[in-house]
Every structure is written in structure tokens, then in C-alpha cells.
């Protein structure tokens, strides 16, 4: 099960961003972490056994990071393309 968590931090200053990065690094469920330009501050790709396991991760870990102001989850309905090929 894969979910994407859009995360808003309490502030966008360097200290807050670095604190989030440091606290999210040890979380094995968070397989990707991207600092974003746009609506949210961070986008995480989370891999869990199922939706229940993801919800437990969100409750136990993600929303307990003190600099997380808000987190919203996106779940894809169907993967229609995945490639690593680049035409150069």
C-alpha cells in the first residue's frame, strides 16, 4: 500500500525544515521525502502493509513530529505508468 502525505510545517525557516528532515529520516515507512514549492512544504511517499497500517503510522509517528502543523493523505487509485527510461 502506498500513500502520499502532503505535510505543512509550523514554519518554513531553516531550523524547522532541518528538524523535520532529521526526525523523518529514521522512519522506514517514509521511502521518499521531497521539499516542495507550492501549497505544501513536504511530500512524503509512505509504504505500509495496508490502509490501517498507514493510519497507525500517521498517528504514531508523522503527526507526533512537533514541527508538523498539518498532514493530508493522497492515495492513488491506479498506477498507469512507471518507468525509469529516459530518451536522450
Q: What role is predicted for each listed range?
A:
Residues 1-88:
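A compositional/biophysical signature of low hydrophobicity enriched in polar/charged and small residues
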